[in-house]
Amino acid sequence: QRAFFKSQVPFVDTPQDLALFSAMYNFASKHKFKYVITGGNNSTEVVRESVDWTYFSTDTLHAKHIHKKFGELELKTFPMRDIFKYRIYDKFISGMKIIKLLDSVPFIKKDAIVELKSLYGWQPYQQKHYESRFTRFFESFWTPKKHGFDKRRAYFSSEILTGQMTRDEALERISKPELSEEEMQKEFEYIAKKLDFSIDEFTEIFKGKNKSFRDYRNNYFLITLGAKISNLIGLDNRKFR
């Protein structure tokens, strides 16, 4: 995580996403699972963010290059599962199938929240992914303030297209941050401490020159080529932008 902050790319959450994804699919592959159930769905995730906002966390060539330039520890036990192993080996050789249960039933986010609250006493968090304190800081402060984009635009666009939010409602939410300036400052100090940066070091990184995934080695060409071929033969319908 420190290496990704130092690299100046916007998607500093890549290490945690890569670790979680890789650990799960490594375990599934080791035990020869044929089905993996996920919460992914078209109802709230039909709009994909630009790759300049969120690059492929499973491009291990990219992650390893950033770590090589800025990392301070060896990655002996850090779980890594490359996108090609996931897309080719898991799906076509081992026969693993990804099941998105929420796409099999009518799924309306607001109705789901009401049901979870009434049945289980669940307390909703402010915004998508804000169950993670790091992600809350990253999406509410780091990317808007440093890199100039708000990931809520993609989230709300999905809900607009599926009739769960109006454009006016989305614009009203986008017009103001989810956290106050005081809360953001507290989170800035908290994350800096957790990552063992001094406030001055973290501030220097924040003010540094922004970079893109294109500034580091990557498999973008091969990934997008594979996606285009999959689209042509009907195996995939994702569109990258």
Task: Please report, for each region that a protein language model flagged, where it lies by residue.
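Nucleotide-activated chemistry modules centered on ATP-dependent adenylation/adenylyltransferase
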Residues: 1-241
